Amino acid sequence: MLTKKPVLSPDRCFSPEPVQRRLAHQFFDSISALPLVCPHGHVDPALLANPAARFGSPTELFIIPDHYILRMLYSRGVPLEALGIPTRDAPTETDHRKIWQLFAEHFYLFQGTPSGLWLKDELTNVFGVDEALNSRNAGRIYDYLEGLLALPKFSPRALFKRFNIEVLCTTDAASDNLENQRSLHEEGFTQIRPTFRPDAVVNLDAPGWRENLTKLESSIGREISSYATFVQALEERRAFFKKMGATATDQGAATPYTTSLSDQEAEAIFARALIGKLNPGDVEQFTGHIFMEMARMSVEDGLVMQMHCGVMRNHNPALFERFGSDKGADIPLNIEWTRNLHPLLSSYGNNQRFRLIIFGMDESTYSREMAPLAGHYPTILLGPPWWFHDSVNGMERYFNQVMETAGIYNTAGFNDDTRAFVSIPARHNVWRRVACNWLAGLVTRGLVDEEEGYDMARALAYDLAKSAYKLD
């Protein structure tokens, strides 16, 4: 490109203190070439199933699908329809060059944020852009990116190989036929594995619950008319996912509340859901009971269970009505783990066939609840900092609050948890850098020795994720 201008510091995420910075570089150099293990994320498998697939325009790649970008721009008054997001009640901008220009004019908003760091990394290291994006060079950079995206070497499959991804797990609805994964496996492309995500049918207040139940019925070829047949359907689909290479499930809820209902109680709630006449409290009780059922099934089939809790979805109802979900309007909640998980752990917490990875948005629970739980129960692992805390400072807070009680070997390593495929290397790079800098700090303070630091760096970068998700 034109004027050479470095936009990424080689010392990013590292301490300014010389001894710690030197050690951080040494640790990072020792693990930077390790393959990427991506055990949880939201990449569309269709991108990889079709050898001819391309990403489309720069706007389609970087802006339209990224709710991190949408929420920041919306917070500063940029209408979502101006960013190409379809709405139910107004025209939507279709000129992708115009959308990119608007994005570039507001690129300064991402200064100091994880999104800004990822975007700079993607533009620099994936696409070779050697100047900072701004309103003046937006058109030129758009043309440059558009040209690259048309080339075979920038296809999703080519970048998958270039990124050195060892395994990538998608997140798929319980009713998904997994045809994309099947076609990939038939080609010998077995690095792509599904993950069983039943939220759309087990959370009775999920948008479109009845329609999603119909899809589940279609996937098993029969009617679901009772709670008993519903549970049978979930068990069958889990078996299908496992046959297709899945090693894990994932379930999200506002809180990690768990409870055991009798068959009669569960049947009564499900019957009310079928006719659309739920009572107050039914949703929480049923979700809490299904967490217990998912744990039981995990003991039986060996799939790792993941729980993502602590977010209020669609906090902005007006935005949801116009644009739908996943547009940046989800907000963290304060939650409680110790009492909520007690029924589940009383039943399964000591069962060596059970493995539970927990993710939370309430950082106040890291040292008070999450780390002590993982530091005691042999079945629990802590997931990495999630969503709003997937950042340099968020990772540092996580390490400092979790590791004293749980150690690193009761954690699940890192997962990128992203829809943005080209951001995967950048996200892993930040995690590895922050981890190495934190470890270097431990060494300089005499808390671990240098040899232990190298071992821990490898574990955090690679080994822990493979082991946690049974990808060995």
From Swiss-Prot:
HAMAP family: UxaC (MF_00675). Keywords: Isomerase. One of its GO terms (molecular function) is glucuronate isomerase activity. This is Uronate isomerase. NCBIfam families: PRK02925.1. Pfam families: UxaC (PF02614). SUPFAM superfamilies: Metallo-dependent hydrolases (SSF51556). Its EC number is 5.3.1.12. Belongs to the metallo-dependent hydrolases superfamily. Uronate isomerase family. Pathway: Carbohydrate metabolism; pentose and glucuronate interconversion. GO terms for biological process: D-galacturonate catabolic process; D-glucuronate catabolic process. It catalyses: D-glucuronate = D-fructuronate; aldehydo-D-galacturonate = keto-D-tagaturonate.
